[in-house]
Amino acid sequence: MNAPASIEAVLASLQPREAASHDFRPRAFRAWVADLPLANVAETGRRVHAALLEMNRTRLPADERLELLRMLARPVEEVTAAVRRHFVGRPLPLPERGRKAARVAIELARQMALGFELAAREAVRGRGSQLAAPAAHGALEQLGRALLTVYQAYAPPPPELWRSLHRVYGLAEAHGLTELPASGPGRRATDVTATAGAAYKRLLLLSLACPYRMRQGEVRAVYEALAEWAADARLEPLGDPVRQEGLFVVHLDSDEPPRYRSLDRAACTPASCRVLDAAPLGERLRAALAAVREEGDEPLVTGERLTASLLRRLVLNWGVMPRRGFARAASRTPADVLVGLSAIHQRLRRERTPATEKGAGTPPQPVPGIEAVISGRAHFETGLPQAGGVPDVWDLAFDAGPPSGSPRMVVIDEDREERRPEPEPEYPVHRCRVEDISPAGYRIHCEPGGEGELQLKVGELLAVREEGEARWQLAVVRWAKCLGAGKLDVGVQVLFPDAEPGYARRQEAGAPWVPVLIVPEVPSVQQPASLLAPPFALRHTEVVNLRGLSGRPRPVRLARTVENTGCFAHYHYAAAGGEEGGTNGGEDDLDSLWGSL
């Protein structure tokens, strides 16, 4: 379902309007669009795709083609929005249905883009040259939507996608259209990306933002932000490599995204290469970073917004060429992988709790006190008065005694009914393969099969244990790529070589104990004490009660949020002083004093 690679071949094979099965006269086509069954997404998508395929094989005037494409904009958007739910917010690797949904969204956008490109080429050759700028912009905008879908599906770009992007920009540049405004329905006069040049730079910068290292909402947030930022970047023909600024180079005659100039080994000429300088975006990024710092990253929401941590990564991606801190070594070592904090906590707890210890490793239960009295359920008992007891004044009532034939006491207490504890879910151990290894992390390859179905997201917490090793290393997924057929490559960064399972609870009435992973302080390597917790269970700077599998709870303060990926939160913590429930001023205080001396 790929668009043709050669636009010349498409132009040469255009058929007259009379040969088409669809009536592409504007009035008739508007009626056809109005009759689309929008409630039936599959049928609407099938009809729209068929109409686009035939339209792109039909010779039409530029103005009519643009009018027809704008009629199809709303149905295409509705179909795309409907199929997005099959791959946005879904764990990786995507199932077959999710991959097909992404292909549908990409294909519709590419066919729309081809139609806009045909209109642009027809406009620059005919009398409607004023239509060429909006047509070229429309093509780049549609190709951008296809590229956004590629990144949100963590899929490799389909063949010829980047070639189409470069080709449309080359057409706009050759005819002086890159800075001309693209007017059209729904276009704001202040829309700074409403030029072909800005739309092209937006997509170059998106690809350079390391989108495979982002969560899907972050990719969308950067894409939306670049609608305002992209115009600030500079794109120039290749010049003096010493004097010309710009870290990135673009090959207009290739099917490749932009890359670092220092790593580019391909032949480059002023006619075929452009240099992208993202340095002018620095002021925009600094202003955005200052704004989000005032709000803070806590609590982190899962919506599409820019956070301080994301902006800092963008500054590095667009302004400084990253250097690998450690050399990679090839490997094909089998490894066991646990996905998610709950699975890791369960495995570590079971491995470190002797089977003979009854109840070990379970969450601590709160001591009954005034909170339990206030929040507990009411308890009612009725029964016969004891013989010889003092009569109650209510015994004078005619119905105070028990019914005849029921001389036994009745206890009504819902909480005392026998309840079966809910079984703990069993989390699978996945068998994968370590492909590349370095002191900082791994590239792991996973295929379908084995115990359970592997499902993860970028930012997920993993535990990895290579074959022959005894300990689980904690790691975080930094990037992912779906390779099709359920295969998945993930890049992970090792966080800690080990951790202790434990529990934490906020210091407020009725707060539950939540599972956490505790990493002790290691002063020799300047590693502060760390806590890995569910993403929204605890709050930055608050004091929580913390305990391991053994020992009493102790209060600690969450001193700093290292990161919150939306899958887990990483905090540095420090002792807050005292034990849970306060001190009694007796021997416990003296014991702590001897220890400090």
Q: Residue ranges of each PLM-predicted region?
A:
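Long, leucine/valine-rich, helix-dominated scaffolding and oligomerization segments
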Residues: 2-211
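N-terminal start-of-domain structural block
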Residues: 10, 16-19, 289, 294, ...
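Generic hydrophobic, helix-prone segments enriched in Leu/Val/Ile
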Residues: 108-112, 116, 288-289, 310-320, ...
